[in-house]
Amino acid sequence: MKIKQLGIVSAGVALATLGTSAAQAALVVVPTGLNPGDQYRLVFVTSGTRNATSSNINDYNTFVTNQVTGSALATQLTTAGFNLGTITWKAIGSTSATSAKVNTGTDGSQPDVPIYLIDGNKVANNNADLWDGSIQTFINRTQIDTSGTDSVWTGTNVGGSAQSPLGNSGFPPMVTIGSPVQTDASWINMIGLSSSNSYTLYGMSSVLTVPTPAVSVPEPSSLLGFITLGGLMLGGAVRKARK
Protein backbone atom coordinates (compact mmCIF):
# COMPACT_ATOMS: atom_id res chain seq x y z
CA MET A 1 0.00 0.00 0.00
CA LYS A 2 2.88 2.40 0.77
CA ILE A 3 4.29 1.82 -2.72
CA LYS A 4 0.92 2.69 -4.25
CA GLN A 5 0.67 5.81 -2.14
CA LEU A 6 4.18 6.80 -3.18
CA GLY A 7 3.20 6.40 -6.81
CA ILE A 8 0.23 8.71 -6.32
CA VAL A 9 2.36 11.32 -4.56
CA SER A 10 5.10 11.14 -7.21
CA ALA A 11 2.62 11.53 -10.04
CA GLY A 12 0.98 14.43 -8.25
CA VAL A 13 4.30 16.18 -7.74
CA ALA A 14 5.18 15.68 -11.40
CA LEU A 15 1.85 17.12 -12.47
CA ALA A 16 2.23 20.14 -10.19
CA THR A 17 5.76 20.77 -11.43
CA LEU A 18 4.69 20.62 -15.05
CA GLY A 19 1.81 22.95 -14.33
CA THR A 20 4.17 25.48 -12.80
CA SER A 21 6.50 25.23 -15.79
CA ALA A 22 3.59 25.90 -18.13
CA ALA A 23 2.72 29.08 -16.28
CA GLN A 24 6.31 30.31 -16.34
CA ALA A 25 6.76 29.55 -20.05
CA ALA A 26 4.14 32.08 -21.18
CA LEU A 27 6.93 34.65 -21.50
CA VAL A 28 9.06 34.03 -24.59
CA VAL A 29 12.44 35.74 -24.60
CA VAL A 30 13.95 33.85 -27.55
CA PRO A 31 11.32 34.00 -30.30
CA THR A 32 10.70 30.97 -32.50
CA GLY A 33 12.79 30.96 -35.66
CA LEU A 34 15.81 32.74 -34.23
CA ASN A 35 19.15 30.93 -34.10
CA PRO A 36 22.26 31.35 -31.93
CA GLY A 37 23.95 34.59 -32.91
CA ASP A 38 20.80 36.26 -34.26
CA GLN A 39 20.10 39.73 -32.90
CA TYR A 40 16.79 41.30 -31.87
CA ARG A 41 15.09 43.42 -29.22
CA LEU A 42 12.30 42.81 -26.71
CA VAL A 43 9.52 45.18 -25.69
CA PHE A 44 6.91 45.12 -22.93
CA VAL A 45 4.54 47.40 -21.07
CA THR A 46 5.12 47.98 -17.37
CA SER A 47 2.69 46.67 -14.79
CA GLY A 48 3.56 49.61 -12.54
CA THR A 49 2.55 53.22 -13.11
CA ARG A 50 4.00 56.67 -12.50
CA ASN A 51 3.39 60.32 -13.41
CA ALA A 52 4.97 62.13 -16.36
CA THR A 53 6.09 65.32 -14.61
CA SER A 54 9.86 64.76 -14.96
CA SER A 55 11.66 66.17 -17.99
CA ASN A 56 14.67 63.89 -17.38
CA ILE A 57 14.50 60.83 -19.65
CA ASN A 58 16.73 58.88 -17.25
CA ASP A 59 13.97 58.94 -14.64
CA TYR A 60 11.76 56.94 -17.00
CA ASN A 61 14.58 54.61 -18.03
CA THR A 62 15.26 53.89 -14.37
CA PHE A 63 11.58 53.21 -13.74
CA VAL A 64 11.44 50.72 -16.62
CA THR A 65 14.66 49.03 -15.47
CA ASN A 66 13.37 48.69 -11.91
CA GLN A 67 10.19 47.11 -13.22
CA VAL A 68 12.25 44.34 -14.83
CA THR A 69 14.50 43.73 -11.82
CA GLY A 70 13.41 40.59 -9.98
CA SER A 71 10.45 40.03 -12.30
CA ALA A 72 9.26 36.97 -14.21
CA LEU A 73 10.88 38.51 -17.29
CA ALA A 74 14.26 38.67 -15.55
CA THR A 75 13.90 35.05 -14.46
CA GLN A 76 13.04 33.92 -17.97
CA LEU A 77 16.00 35.77 -19.47
CA THR A 78 18.35 34.13 -16.98
CA THR A 79 16.85 30.71 -17.71
CA ALA A 80 17.42 31.28 -21.43
CA GLY A 81 21.12 31.92 -20.82
CA PHE A 82 21.32 35.73 -20.84
CA ASN A 83 23.53 37.77 -18.52
CA LEU A 84 21.15 40.35 -17.04
CA GLY A 85 24.05 42.67 -16.33
CA THR A 86 24.63 43.18 -20.05
CA ILE A 87 21.02 44.14 -20.86
CA THR A 88 19.80 47.72 -20.59
CA TRP A 89 16.16 48.81 -20.64
CA LYS A 90 14.91 52.11 -22.00
CA ALA A 91 11.50 53.76 -22.02
CA ILE A 92 9.88 54.21 -25.42
CA GLY A 93 9.23 57.83 -24.59
CA SER A 94 10.31 61.35 -25.44
CA THR A 95 11.23 64.40 -23.40
CA SER A 96 11.82 67.80 -24.96
CA ALA A 97 15.56 67.03 -24.99
CA THR A 98 15.55 63.35 -26.02
CA SER A 99 13.29 61.65 -28.55
CA ALA A 100 12.09 58.07 -28.19
CA LYS A 101 14.09 57.10 -31.28
CA VAL A 102 17.30 58.43 -29.78
CA ASN A 103 16.58 57.11 -26.30
CA THR A 104 15.99 53.55 -27.52
CA GLY A 105 18.69 53.59 -30.18
CA THR A 106 16.16 52.93 -32.93
CA ASP A 107 17.40 56.00 -34.82
CA GLY A 108 20.09 54.11 -36.72
CA SER A 109 22.78 54.55 -34.08
CA GLN A 110 22.55 50.86 -33.11
CA PRO A 111 22.05 47.62 -35.10
CA ASP A 112 18.76 47.57 -37.01
CA VAL A 113 17.05 44.41 -35.77
CA PRO A 114 13.54 42.91 -35.44
CA ILE A 115 11.57 43.80 -32.34
CA TYR A 116 9.43 41.29 -30.44
CA LEU A 117 6.90 41.41 -27.64
CA ILE A 118 7.92 39.26 -24.67
CA ASP A 119 5.37 36.63 -25.71
CA GLY A 120 7.20 35.84 -28.97
CA ASN A 121 5.03 37.90 -31.34
CA LYS A 122 6.82 40.28 -33.68
CA VAL A 123 6.11 43.97 -33.15
CA ALA A 124 8.26 45.36 -35.98
CA ASN A 125 10.65 44.03 -38.61
CA ASN A 126 13.16 46.81 -37.97
CA ASN A 127 13.48 50.42 -36.83
CA ALA A 128 11.73 51.88 -39.86
CA ASP A 129 8.83 49.48 -39.40
CA LEU A 130 8.49 50.52 -35.75
CA TRP A 131 8.16 54.18 -36.69
CA ASP A 132 6.05 53.94 -39.86
CA GLY A 133 2.72 54.64 -38.16
CA SER A 134 1.68 51.12 -37.14
CA ILE A 135 3.01 47.99 -35.46
CA GLN A 136 2.30 44.31 -36.02
CA THR A 137 0.97 43.31 -32.61
CA PHE A 138 -0.18 44.90 -29.35
CA ILE A 139 2.53 45.80 -26.82
CA ASN A 140 0.36 44.57 -23.98
CA ARG A 141 2.44 41.99 -22.08
CA THR A 142 3.96 43.07 -18.77
CA GLN A 143 7.21 42.03 -17.11
CA ILE A 144 5.21 39.99 -14.58
CA ASP A 145 3.38 38.10 -17.35
CA THR A 146 0.03 39.87 -17.14
CA SER A 147 -1.96 41.64 -19.83
CA GLY A 148 -1.60 45.42 -19.79
CA THR A 149 -4.56 47.56 -20.81
CA ASP A 150 -3.87 50.89 -19.07
CA SER A 151 -2.84 53.98 -21.02
CA VAL A 152 0.90 54.42 -21.63
CA TRP A 153 2.95 57.60 -21.29
CA THR A 154 4.94 58.22 -24.50
CA GLY A 155 5.26 61.95 -25.21
CA THR A 156 5.90 60.80 -28.76
CA ASN A 157 4.50 61.04 -32.29
CA VAL A 158 4.27 58.16 -34.78
CA GLY A 159 7.71 58.95 -36.18
CA GLY A 160 9.46 58.60 -32.83
CA SER A 161 9.96 62.31 -32.13
CA ALA A 162 8.67 64.36 -29.21
CA GLN A 163 5.07 65.55 -29.16
CA SER A 164 3.60 66.90 -25.91
CA PRO A 165 6.67 65.31 -24.32
CA LEU A 166 7.23 63.76 -20.92
CA GLY A 167 7.73 66.56 -18.41
CA ASN A 168 5.89 69.05 -20.63
CA SER A 169 6.10 72.47 -18.99
CA GLY A 170 3.25 74.00 -20.98
CA PHE A 171 -0.06 75.04 -19.47
CA PRO A 172 -1.86 72.87 -18.92
CA PRO A 173 1.00 70.33 -18.78
CA MET A 174 -0.37 67.75 -21.23
CA VAL A 175 1.64 64.67 -22.22
CA THR A 176 0.91 62.30 -25.10
CA ILE A 177 -0.29 58.81 -24.23
CA GLY A 178 -0.57 55.64 -26.29
CA SER A 179 -2.67 52.49 -26.03
CA PRO A 180 -1.22 48.99 -25.50
CA VAL A 181 -4.23 47.46 -27.26
CA GLN A 182 -3.84 49.28 -30.57
CA THR A 183 -1.61 48.62 -33.57
CA ASP A 184 -2.33 51.78 -35.56
CA ALA A 185 -0.82 55.17 -34.71
CA SER A 186 -2.68 55.08 -31.38
CA TRP A 187 -0.17 52.61 -29.96
CA ILE A 188 2.22 55.54 -29.47
CA ASN A 189 0.16 58.69 -30.12
CA MET A 190 -3.46 58.84 -29.04
CA ILE A 191 -4.30 61.95 -26.97
CA GLY A 192 -2.70 64.25 -24.41
CA LEU A 193 -3.50 64.01 -20.71
CA SER A 194 -2.37 65.80 -17.56
CA SER A 195 1.17 64.82 -16.58
CA SER A 196 0.09 64.40 -12.95
CA ASN A 197 -1.86 61.24 -13.79
CA SER A 198 -0.32 57.81 -13.23
CA TYR A 199 0.06 55.57 -16.27
CA THR A 200 2.34 52.81 -17.50
CA LEU A 201 5.38 52.98 -19.80
CA TYR A 202 6.67 50.90 -22.69
CA GLY A 203 10.10 49.36 -22.16
CA MET A 204 12.60 48.23 -24.81
CA SER A 205 15.73 46.15 -24.36
CA SER A 206 19.13 46.84 -25.78
CA VAL A 207 20.06 44.68 -28.78
CA LEU A 208 20.08 41.04 -27.66
CA THR A 209 21.99 38.14 -29.21
CA VAL A 210 20.58 34.62 -29.02
CA PRO A 211 22.92 32.71 -26.66
CA THR A 212 25.13 29.90 -27.96
CA PRO A 213 23.88 27.31 -27.44
CA ALA A 214 20.38 28.72 -27.15
CA VAL A 215 18.38 27.40 -24.23
CA SER A 216 15.06 26.10 -25.49
CA VAL A 217 12.07 26.96 -23.32
CA PRO A 218 9.05 24.75 -24.18
CA GLU A 219 6.09 26.46 -25.79
CA PRO A 220 2.88 26.47 -23.71
CA SER A 221 1.25 24.11 -26.26
CA SER A 222 4.02 21.56 -25.78
CA LEU A 223 3.77 21.85 -22.04
CA LEU A 224 0.05 21.18 -22.29
CA GLY A 225 0.90 17.77 -23.68
CA PHE A 226 3.23 17.10 -20.76
CA ILE A 227 0.54 18.17 -18.32
CA THR A 228 -1.92 15.81 -19.98
CA LEU A 229 0.62 13.01 -19.67
CA GLY A 230 1.08 13.87 -16.02
CA GLY A 231 -2.67 13.66 -15.53
CA LEU A 232 -2.76 10.22 -17.12
CA MET A 233 0.08 9.11 -14.84
CA LEU A 234 -1.83 10.34 -11.82
CA GLY A 235 -5.03 8.67 -12.95
CA GLY A 236 -3.22 5.39 -13.53
CA ALA A 237 -1.66 5.49 -10.10
CA VAL A 238 -5.05 6.12 -8.50
CA ARG A 239 -6.67 3.21 -10.35
CA LYS A 240 -3.88 0.86 -9.31
CA ALA A 241 -4.21 1.99 -5.70
CA ARG A 242 -7.89 1.08 -5.71
CA LYS A 243 -7.27 -2.50 -6.87
Task: Give the residues covered by each predicted segment.
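Sec-dependent, cleavable N-terminal signal peptides
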Residues: 1-26, 243
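Intrinsically disordered, low-complexity segments
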Residues: 8, 19, 214, 219-220
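Serine/proline-rich low-complexity intrinsically disordered segments, especially terminal tails, linkers
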Residues: 12, 23, 207-208, 223-224
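Compositionally biased, low-complexity segments enriched in small residues
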Residues: 13-16, 150, 217, 224
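Juxtamembrane cytosolic interface motif at the C-terminal end of transmembrane helices
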Residues: 20, 235-240
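Hydrophobic alpha-helical segments
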Residues: 22, 61, 200, 222, ...
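Secreted/extracellular ectodomain signature
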Residues: 26-216
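A short, hydrophobic C-terminal helix/tail in secreted or cell-surface proteins
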Residues: 218-237
